[in-house]
Amino acid sequence: AFGSRRPTTTATATTSNNNNNDDNNRYTRAQSGSSAQPHQMKDMWEAYVSTNQRFTETVREVYEDGDMIWVHGYHLMLVPLMIRAYLPNATIGFNMHIPFPTSEIFRVLPWRREILMGLLGADFIGFQVPGHSRHFVHCCTRVLLGTSSIGAAQISYRGRVTRLLVCECCFYCIHCFECCFYCSLF
């Protein structure tokens, strides 16, 4: 039913398969959930960006026309926009496996704009529960002033529309992504 555009697993990039151990250590430390001191934040952000760039490069190397790209997890929130810069016509989905914070919490992050713009590079963003999707919409409309919410299920930013979906059934629900892509054809 989905033709040749059916999602496929084409690559798995991991931070452990590259030679930049210093970046890996900084990235792992930043993602470990430990609290960061203010003087460490710039260093951790640079490692985060670098790791997202490496994932993007891996996708670019294996991408073939018609592939769907599905990115998973908060540790790769910049990847959709990075991929979009190289592959403007690619179909990109992103799945957020953790709660998305409220705008009151999110607005204190120094790189809040970059994170939101990174996510909005996706065609679809999946959340676990409706409240997390609402938090994302509120963050976008408050932080990215040019953003508009099209109902509760879509965000428009800089001429692109990103669809939001809620899939409570499981963490890796490829069926939800397939359905979203299929419905977008009509």
Model-derived features with residue positions:
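Catalytic cores of carbohydrate-active enzymes across secretory and cytosolic contexts
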Residues: 1-12, 17, 23-176, 183-186
